[in-house]
UniProtKB/Swiss-Prot annotation:
Assembly: Homohexamer.
A GO CC term attached to the entry: cytoplasm
Function: Catalyzes the reversible phosphorylation of UMP to UDP.
Similarity remark: Belongs to the UMP kinase family.
Name of the molecule in the record: Uridylate kinase
One Pfam family, short name: AA_kinase
Amino acid sequence: MADVKYKRIMLKLSGEALAGDKGFGINPPVIKTVAEEVKDVYNLGIQIAIVVGGGNMWRGEAGAQMGMERAQADYIGMLATIMNALALQDNLESIGVPTRVQTSIEMRQIAEPYIRRKAIRHLEKERVVIFAGGTGSPYFSTDTTAALRAAEINADAILMAKNGVDGIYSADPKKDPAAVKFDQLTQLDIINKGLNVMDTTASSLSMDNDIPFVVFNLNESGNIRKVVEGENIGTTVRGK
């Protein structure tokens, strides 16, 4: 294995990142590029787990506007993450990266059910594992899923790959030209400064299990590899 900072990672991809400029659905050139970026890191010998969101297919707010019950809207969102996971699996395997999808909601015809020990074994056998379906329960975000699964598989770090966002700022840099980018933070810093990075449940899980996470721009080629190799890009948030 190459000289790297993190040997087992949890990569969190937003659904919107797969849509690219289209804003909705899956953009084939974009998901192909994401798969190639993952392969570049995989070739270093890194064990890679992935959680992908579903915002490119379904937003909970859309359900709320329709008067839909929150739990029902969340279940639709979970199915959206599974569609994204299968598409990403197909793109990864088409370029020679062995990949398994595990879902928190059983659908054995298309994916394995989530089993922690089996997921870890896949990683040890040099297979990428994509966790889909969220936690399997409504009211929990895919950020929380990433933090939970990262703790369960003993990941070294969570890589928060953002669509066009290169780190954490003191304010929205698009609205405030005086916004300052942070290179290093702690979870308590995020809470005390009121920074909107991930939901409080995900943040608490990361802090309680002392799992660092790195927020960086997915759209810049090679960034996933740079984070894994320890290059100082984006914002690193320490668990404690």
